[in-house]
Amino acid sequence: MADDLPAMAHGLSALSRFFIDDGTLGATLLRVAQLACQVSPADMAGITMLVDGRPATGVFTDPEAPEIDVAQYDTGHGPCLDAFRHQRVYRIDSIADDARWPEFARMAAAHGITATLSIPLSARGESLGALNLYSRAAVFDQLVTEQAEVFARQAAIVLSNAQVYWDARQLGENMRQAMQSRSAIDQAIGILMADGGRSPDEAFQLLVRASQRKNRKLRDIAAEIVEGVSRRGGAAAG
């Protein structure tokens, strides 16, 4: 119900207890969208965000949501996009009577949607996207809107923390791979130096030429050389 304060309290409590490492960033986004439906009278929810540099419905609770949103992404106009761009709340009480986004309105009406509510998601001064709620009935009154804004503010903090966490994890993984690559390359250079009496630069250039000739990454060529020596060493020891 629109005045279901216990549901809102439950949703906010669930957000505050959310463990970022419980899943992927996509799982975090989806959980936020699902909670938004639980604390509001919306029939479905989606989150507009940048995907590969372009606005898109990154997650949704119903496959109809991205089908509705595609009209605004194609035309560049719609409540979800405007909420994202301008960091303002946009509410449509009656799709049939709203003339601001005609293409979006036609698509929403075709899916039986009567009302929508788009709320910006921002934290630490950064625009993260927009939370979009859809209903087949005119249920987004002022109280629902205010409650949804409270939820969106808390959700934005969760999403921002999740983004920071997963960015840090990715950076750590990239650094780990870089260190492994550097180690393999250094070992391969040492092997080539010992094998042919080459200088460090000559050994490195040999790796580079092999990488270019075979159209493979330098670290993969190096790892193959190191693995080959390890296999020969193991066979000799056996």
Feature locations, PLM:
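Signal-transducing alpha-helical linker
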Residues: 3-10, 14, 20, 156-170, ...
